[in-house]
Amino acid sequence: MNLTMQLAVIVAVCLCLAEGAPDVRLTRTKQQRPTRGFKNVEMMTARGFGKRDRPHPRAERDVDHQAPSARPNRGTPTFKSPTVGIARDFGKRASQYGNEEEIRVTRGTFKPNSNILIARGYGKRTQLPQIDGVYGLDNFWEMLETSPEREVQEVDEKTLESIPLDWFVNEMLNNPDFARSVVRKFIDLNQDGMLSSEELLRNF
């Protein structure tokens, strides 16, 4: 190769390098930094974005900021004004161990002398039959009739052998059911509900 050809190749290489250099710079300048949080260009100038622990420069009117504490509900303001202080506890998290004893339900303890343990009427299906008449009138006469048999069967049991006269007269006057049962048992022999002259005068 002669000298002119070498110079021509060198000039061509320099021109290629010169044309490629501005393109690389333009591509570097066109790249934008990645913005965090906002995609809108107008919202990229958010003041205080990403600042966590810096105090606010403006002092709000009715808010008194507290110092950050170790509790999870840090940064909750306390209000001085009664009108603003309606939402004083709004947003506060309940403490994990503070109200644990209040939430627990106390189980009942066994008290032997308690009235609740007595189940009155439990298991009773039917009530006792009510007796319309005078209690013991029919059984009274049956006892008189079967008194000899009872003496044979139960020697130790005291049998009814006599009735006081005053008690009998008083019961006949004041207790019509008792008087009716006496008449039916001793006078009305045929049990027809009618008293004949023979039944009334049979002992005379």
Swiss-Prot record:
Residues carrying Phenylalanine amide: F49
Alphabetical GO biological process terms: monoatomic ion transport; negative regulation of monoatomic ion transport; neuropeptide signaling pathway; positive regulation of juvenile hormone biosynthetic process; regulation of heart rate
Tissue spec: Expressed extensively in the brain, frontal ganglion and terminal ganglion of the day 2 fifth instar larva (at protein level). Not expressed in the larval brain after day 4 of the fifth instar, or in the brain of the pupa or adult. Expression in the terminal ganglion is localized to cells in the posterior portion of the seventh neuromere of day 2 fifth instar larvae. In the pupa and adult expression is detected in the medial region of neuromere 6, the dorsal medial region of neuromere 7, and the posterior neuromere of the terminal ganglion (at protein level).
InterPro entries with a match to the protein in the record: EF_Hand_1_Ca_BS
Induction details: In the 5th instar larva isoform 1 is induced in the nerve cord by starvation, ingestion of the ecdysteroid agonist RH-5992 or parasitization with C.congregata.
Propeptide feature ranges: 21-35, 53-204
Stretches with biased composition (Basic and acidic residues): 50-65
A GO CC term attached to the entry: extracellular region
Gene Ontology molecular function terms on file: neuropeptide hormone activity
Signal peptide location: 1-20
Localization terms from the record: Secreted
Coiled-coil annotated residue ranges, if any: none
Record flagged with keyword Signal: yes
Keywords from the named record: Amidation, Cleavage on pair of basic residues, Hormone, Ion transport, Neuropeptide, Secreted, Signal, Transport
Function, as annotated: Neuropeptide stimulator of juvenile hormone synthesis. Cardioregulatory neurohormone that increases heart beat rate in the adult but not in the larva. Inhibits active ion transport in the midgut of feeding fourth instar and day 2 fifth instar larva, but not in the midgut of pharate or wandering fifth instar larva.
Protein name: Allatotropin
Source organism of the structure: Manduca sexta (Tobacco hawkmoth)
